[in-house]
Amino acid sequence: MNKKIISNNNAYPRFLNQLAKDLSKFYYYKLSKKFKVQNKIKGKGYDPVTTADKAFEKFIRFKINKKFPDHEIIGEEFGYKKSKSDYSWVIDPIDGTRSFVIGSPTWSNLISLNYKGNPIYGLANFPILKKYYYNQSDKVAYVVENNKRKKISVNKKAKYKDLKLAAGLHGAISLKKQKKITKFLNLMQFPCSDALSYAQVCEGKLDVVFQCSNKIWDIHPLIPIINASGGIVSTIDNRDAKFAGNILASSNKNIHIKIQSLLKPIAK
């Protein structure tokens, strides 16, 4: 991460702050009542996409193009807008579409700004919960709830013996493989709520989150917020989280290493 870029440019956090507010207004004015659902998977399986996903992404792209017309954009629903710029935006218009479809409030809008492929600023906006998370710099992250801003930090004092751990396997790990990580499974206390669980690590409410099969738009917007709040995030085989996949986020390094060791049998 280029710390000079992070520290010298407040335009991006300001933009993300305003975007969060605009997205919440857009939802309540345009999308809260009617939407259509399609299944992306033909045949067996269920991967829903809604007209709201597409409307949100169009809105986010419009805002980015208006403010930063030369930047590249990568979105879950509409793909790539190519550019020669070193800056790119990664968009998940609705993270937790299944939650959105059934009326659960835990879905979010996720947006990151990347520099040369590395996430440097992130936003996780939760319109129904009336709050959003973002990083101001590489060392400072905030939650804004009911228009009140509060600096957030992971629980650095968390210990292995009393972990608060959430996990989402999403059917990605077979029962055969799950039998290899029974010590980890016995530590699970909470189900994952998509991006909200990562955000709760940043606030110190959870100590560990493990999620399978993350795409770049699922995790890139969370990486800068996790790092800025003092957390650790990587793949379970200790690669950079920007490569996505099976992602582990922890409140401190000792816990991270310990949980990685428990997940080692399924890391390859």
PLM region descriptions:
Residues 1-94:
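N-terminal subdomain of lithium-sensitive/metallo-dependent phosphomonoesterases centered on the IMPase/IPPase/PAP
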Residues 27, 31, 53, 64, ...:
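Residue-level signal for inorganic ion chemistry
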Residues 54, 77, 93-96, 127, ...:
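Generic detector of well-ordered alpha-helical packing
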Residues 79, 104, 125, 138, ...:
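Residue-level structural signal for beta-strand termini and adjacent loop
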Residues 83-142:
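DPxDG-like acidic metal-binding loop motif
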Residues 114-118, 128, 137-140, 146-147, ...:
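Short loop segments at secondary-structure junctions
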Residues 154-268:
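An extended, acidic
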